[in-house]
Amino acid sequence: MTDHTNDSSDKNGKLLYCSFCGKSQHEVRKLIAGPSVFICDECVDLCNDIIREEIQESASEGSSDKLPKPHEISAILDQYVIGQKRAKKVLAVAVYNHYKRLRFGDKTAKDKEPVELGKSNILLVGPTGSGKTLLAETLARLLDVPFTIADATTLTEAGYVGEDVENIIQKLLQKCDYDVEKAQQGIVYIDEIDKISRKSDNPSITRDVSGEGVQQALLKLIEGTIASVPPQGGRKHPQQEFLQVDTSNILFICGGAFAGLDKVIRDRSEKGGIGFAAEVKSKDDKRNFGETLHDLEPEDLVRYGLIPEFVGRLPVIATLDELDKAALIQILTEPKNALTKQYGKLFEMEGVQIDFRPDALDAVAERALERKTGARGLRSIMESVLLDTMYRIPSEEHVVKVVVDELVIKGESEPLLVYEQVEKPPKAASAED
């Protein structure tokens, strides 16, 4: 039924027309009058659609401008992670291409011959404490996307005690207050991925629910599927309405130390021989774990225990080097959140300056190398060395500086406390005077 208001007819009863489309007041639902002009409800809707599309286009253009270039991503990673130049380059290109694919995917779909861009998930391989998790965390913070870390060792096949692989997506949803659209553009880091390698090359009568079984369960999730996730999680609330999350645009980064992988690589790459055909090598020719990883091929991961289908879902492989003494000293001092800067800020809150002598930093790096835990061991060393000092300082008066040298790190002396000079009050005059 046509709805006319007093605005859609003049005082003389003359038939009115829309000034934009030319339709009469009887052909439209509503005609709105302005100063000597009229507009119908259909033209208003059309204007709203045009404005809405322009806003969306400008928003998408603005968001694409905010996407940092690969060299910018690498430069920002340099501020937080020391070394690992090649790994940063691989990550920067992979992440840039992934989010470029998301932001321009709709435009390529309108082409005469649309090209579907595949997703490039990432595998980080490197020794403990080399910066795998920190790289993933820094990327997510840089791109301002939801980020979650999952531990592969806690995952099991559905129906067994442990976490389902869908719980990973639920954790991602929790990070963005169950905003499905945001979660679908997030980053998931699966740590300890090497711990779910197949236990044996030979088929077994017992089911490997935490190894190959988990790899099988992760296949579709990583490649892209519609995951059904309960808002409150788990199997305890089957009556809840499930959220449908498309994982095809979620970037999965898997990381692991892969202890023993260097031997697998050497067995493949180093040709053996007998007698005069044998290749002679000195002990000095033996490369360390990180250097050996540079020759990593997908087939080595399969021999290590990852199933071929799972390796195929992780086309981008970045290897990280072992951290040497010089790199550990840099980690202590150079990054934005370097440990020496963190402890400096803690002591500054008490009005005290802390001074780490160069020989102290050298000794900390030496102890970390002995522990073979990479950069992860640096904080525990610093905590144990500074524990007593941090216990005393809040109660001590007039302390202005703490000096830490090599002997302190080795446990042979205590940190040197420097006090401010306090003037003693003059003695009161005696009664005899």
Curated annotation (Swiss-Prot):
NCBIfam families in the record: clpX (TIGR00382), PRK05342.1 (NF003745)
Record domain ClpX-type ZB: where: 5-59
Binding site for Zn(2+): C18, C21, C40, C43
Functional summary from the UniProt entry: ATP-dependent specificity component of the Clp protease. It directs the protease to specific substrates. Can perform chaperone functions in the absence of ClpP.
Cross-referenced Pfam families: AAA_2, ClpB_D2-small, zf-C4_ClpX
GO biological process: cell division; proteolysis involved in protein catabolic process
Family: Belongs to the ClpX chaperone family.
HAMAP family: ClpX (MF_00175)
Residues that coordinate or bind ATP: P127, T128, G129, S130, G131, K132, T133, L134
Assigned GO CC terms: HslUV protease complex
PANTHER family on file: ATP-DEPENDENT CLP PROTEASE ATP-BINDING SUBUNIT CLPX-LIKE, MITOCHONDRIAL, ATP-DEPENDENT CLP PROTEASE ATP-BINDING SUBUNIT CLPX-LIKE, MITOCHONDRIAL-RELATED
Key words, A-Z: ATP-binding, Chaperone, Metal-binding, Nucleotide-binding, Zinc
Molecular function (Gene Ontology), one example: ATP hydrolysis activity
UniProt name for this protein: ATP-dependent Clp protease ATP-binding subunit ClpX
Subunit-level organization: Component of the ClpX-ClpP complex. Forms a hexameric ring that, in the presence of ATP, binds to fourteen ClpP subunits assembled into a disk-like structure with a central cavity, resembling the structure of eukaryotic proteasomes.
Signal peptide: none
